[in-house]
A protein has these predicted regions:
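Generic beta-strand structural signal
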Residues: 121-124, 128-130, 165-168, 177-180
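Metal-dependent nuclease catalytic cores that hydrolyze phosphodiester bonds in DNA/RNA
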Residues: 1-131, 136-154
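Broad hydrophobic/π-residue packing in well-ordered secondary structure
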Residues: 62-64, 101, 163, 170-172, ...
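Short, well-structured alpha-helical interface segments that form or flank functional binding sites
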Residues: 87, 91, 120, 162-169, ...
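A short acidic, glycine-rich active-site loop
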Residues: 150-164
Length: 281
């Protein structure tokens, strides 16, 4: 049975009262939730290091972090968001264990070496000989990326968080295929398995990008922003305004990078606000 169908069948059976969750699974879930609280609230202050989970992000973003650039102001809700994400991962694992999914490894430390540099990371789970990453997703990301039949390609179009490099680095470290992502919709509770393609083309590209980023960061290559301003469209028409690129929107250093060139303003033609390059007309 396919992974997603196996998970969904267990959940349906549970709703009907036809399945149960073993006590050892319940205990492991509880321990993982405790670990999430310890990690998020008792962990040490994080300093910049080369990490498998982040090395696929835009190079300029990582350069800013390494150089100690001033990040965007933090919101208190971010701490709960991160904690919630860890607990969702624990919940998904408990459901898969109860569904008798063939889990071969969980939270396993791995490493990747290029040249004389080794970076480390922790893969989420190995199932049926494939490495998967568990992601908690917003309704928008779940609907428009993770749950689509072409979800992998959609993520590849604008992989602002380096998810693809992360997955292939983990799988390459174990000499196993990358299976894709097990995504949980934080708003609806839906689960989707977004499969990675069997072709090695994405793998070569992702690991190649990661290796280039590693070399650039180790060699202290001079900073250069990788993204230009973007022409704004409203109802498929050019407005004459410019916004920052999607990758810049998700970057924690956009104001340090763009400086006084950008302003956060309400869209004159809509209800939302966004980052503009110059005052919007």
């Amino acid at each position: 049975m396919e992974l997603q169908k196996q998970i969904e069948q267990y959940l349906l059976d549970s709703l009907e009262g036809d399945s149960s969750m073993d006590e050892d699974v319940v205990e492991r879930f509880g321990e993982r939730c405790k670990d999430a609280l310890r990690k998020q609230f008792n962990g040490k202050k994080r300093e910049f290091t080369l990490r498998m989970s982040a090395i696929g992000r835009p190079l300029c973003q990582q350069q800013m972090e390494k150089e100690g650039a001033k990040p965007e102001p933090l919101k208190p809700s971010l701490k709960l968001k991160f904690t919630y994400g860890d607990m969702i991962e624990a919940l998904v694992m408990a459901v898969m264990e109860a569904a008798k999914v063939n889990i071969e490894s969980f939270q396993e430390g791995v490493s990747h070496t290029t040249g004389s540099t080794t970076i480390k990371g922790t893969l989420d789970v190995i199932i049926d000989g494939k490495v998967y990453d568990i992601k908690s997703a917003s309704q928008h990301a779940f609907k428009n990326k993770f749950s689509r039949s072409d979800g992998f390609a959609k993520i590849a179009e604008d992989d602002a968080f380096g998810y693809i490099a992360q997955g292939y680095l983990y799988s390459s470290a174990k000499d196993l295929p990358f299976g894709g992502w097990i995504a949980y919709n934080k708003e609806t509770g839906d689960i989707a398995v977004c499969k990675a393609p069997a072709s090695d083309a994405y793998k070569r590209s992702a690991i190649g990008k990661a290796n280039k980023n590693i070399k650039a960061l180790v060699d202290d290559v001079p900073f250069k922003r990788q993204f230009e301003k973007v022409k704004e469209k409203f109802r498929n028409k050019i407005t004459g305004n410019y916004t920052i690129a999607l990758n810049c929107r998700y970057c924690n250093f956009k104001t340090s990078c763009w400086g006084n060139e950008i302003v956060f303003r309400k869209n004159p033609r809509g209800a939302s606000s966004k980052w503009y390059v110059g005052e919007p007309k």
